[in-house]
């Protein structure tokens, strides 16, 4: 007996078209174009999950540097002083303090002043 792919093909097409929701025009409606766009979008998603980490770290560095320069020091000297003073605050927390709680950031800066 010959095996036909009707059910399997329908299931596979439905799966791809379901994932392609939100794409424009034929990239949403036509299986072949949707499949190509889906492969590309999965590549972008994979790549950008890695880039996101880099971009956030650089954003934190910029914010910490801006707050440090308001108090007459540089980012690199501040981070070195933190390490010497054995204060283990990460960049994410420091950037949040610099943006939302300047008083706390200033107290940390005063705490490491002698190590600058």
UniProtKB/Swiss-Prot annotation:
Pfam families in UniProt: Ribosomal_L20 (PF00453)
Keyword check for Transmembrane helix: no
InterPro entries, A to Z: Ribosomal_bL20, RIBOSOMAL_L20_CS, Ribosomal_protein_bL20_C
Ribonucleoprotein found in the keyword field: yes
GO molecular function, one term: structural constituent of ribosome
Record's GO cellular component terms: ribonucleoprotein complex; ribosome
Protein's job: Binds directly to 23S ribosomal RNA and is necessary for the in vitro assembly process of the 50S ribosomal subunit. It is not involved in the protein synthesizing functions of that subunit.
Family: Belongs to the bacterial ribosomal protein bL20 family.
Alphabetical list of HAMAP family matching this protein: Ribosomal_bL20
Name of the protein described by the UniProt record: Large ribosomal subunit protein bL20
Organism: Helicobacter acinonychis (strain Sheeba)
Lineage, broadest ranks: Bacteria, Pseudomonadati, Campylobacterota, Epsilonproteobacteria, Campylobacterales
Gene: rplT
